[in-house]
Amino acid sequence: MTNHMLDEVRSAAVAAARTARESYRAGKIQPTAGVAPGMTQANMIALPRDWAWDFLLYAQRNPKACPVLDVIEAGAYHTVLAEGADIRTDIPLYRVWRNGRLVEEVADATPLWQEHPDLVTFLIGCSFTFETPLLEAGIEVRHITDGSNVPMYRTNRQCRPAGRLHGELVVSMRPIAASRIADAAMISGRFPSVHGAPVHVGNPEALGIADIHRPDFGDAVRIESGEIPVFWACGVTPQAAVMASGVPFAVTHAPGHMFVTDVPDSTYHV
Amino acid sequence: MTNHMLDEVRSAAVAAARTARESYRAGKIQPTAGVAPGMTQANMIALPRDWAWDFLLYAQRNPKACPVLDVIEAGAYHTVLAEGADIRTDIPLYRVWRNGRLVEEVADATPLWQEHPDLVTFLIGCSFTFETPLLEAGIEVRHITDGSNVPMYRTNRQCRPAGRLHGELVVSMRPIAASRIADAAMISGRFPSVHGAPVHVGNPEALGIADIHRPDFGDAVRIESGEIPVFWACGVTPQAAVMASGVPFAVTHAPGHMFVTDVPDSTYHV
């Protein structure tokens, strides 16, 4: 590919990310798997300043589940990950949490920043980042094939606590053909800041998952004959901590409805 | 190697780390390059609680220079990285900083924890971790050959600031034969949480290094004909931030005199 062609591909990807964010700002709601391919997507959690230290420490102690890509300081809503973006409006769907309970889903979080002007926002790596490399290697990603949301599960594994925060690990699942599991592990493993290699392959019961066809978040997907469920640490883990710890107030993205950045996936490749 | 042999090798490595820490606790002072081969070593900085958020954010924003391996909460001095270790005594040499100036080097930091009972301690990845894999690949590590401290340099590259903290990037340097630079980059790149791949190869002037034979920290090393200086982000970067930002009080390790943990280097391999 010539430099000129490469520039055009990059510009098109950034433009796709921008267009997606603008459509969400205008009110469109959709899961973001497969949106703006090649651009990194991020999980979001915003907490009052008083909780920011506990959360950043929780993330540091659980880096596979909570790899922090950016922190937006108290009251601010711009990020270095996407020029001109507004974190209060540019995610397709938000969840509002009060005293550890999900109370509402909204498409525009601006009023919540007015209610809590000191929110500190954390943007956390998302496994969607390594889905493009998986697809490029000829590994099917079922929820993209089917146009659905990735299935996510609460597990019986406790994260390492920090301050007032504790909770269980949440995982995402992709069914992978037995012959491609090693490839999927190696490819995703080269992206440690967006969850990296799988935490578990097969045997959902060992993670405390009673029914693989009934995820706690997102949509169930087909598991074909010859495929094994493969589990990756998931950026919904902070929402589990909000629930388990009874955090007084938090705003998060809705699972699968991510913040689409202007950062190419390749940035996180080691 | 049989399982039994592997267990013995591991036990010997943990024992070597423990013996090293005990000797430092007893007062021995030495640079730790090459000590307890295969066990991860860490940079240390302890700051009053009021500065902890700024520092953790600074580390998150400059992950190549400041990859956080553990945070010890206010007033505590034990770490999950080394059972039974005491962070106040088990580093061979400490530096004491007041108002951004180095005022003292001490072998026992216990009185400083009495003076500031709310110190939060950060343990940060160290490039010594990938030196064993470099040696195993037949790449000479000059400062280990010569039994000296690794040379470190302040650069003209500013880190991304956080709160009250700003400062320049500090780098370590290893001269590498031209034919092995790609290997050294790939091998170290597989250890992203201990500084990862080099930030710069050759051309010290571009980093603002006036004289490669006069490092700002550590010892000068020979650069043989056919070798190129290769630069990695360095965990002394927090000390540069302490100086540049005039931090009122901090305790750090002395450059090259690291905290030797019980964690095998391979833990940080992706």
From Swiss-Prot, chains A, B:
Single annotated GO MF: lyase activity
Residues annotated as transmembrane: none
Keywords, comma-separated and alphabetical: Lyase
Enzyme Commission numbers on file: 4.2.1.-
Matching InterPro entries: D-Glu_cyclase, Putative_hydro-lyase, UPF0317
Enzyme class: lyase
Entry annotated with the keyword Lyase: yes
Entry's family note: Belongs to the D-glutamate cyclase family.
Protein name: Putative hydro-lyase Reut_A2449
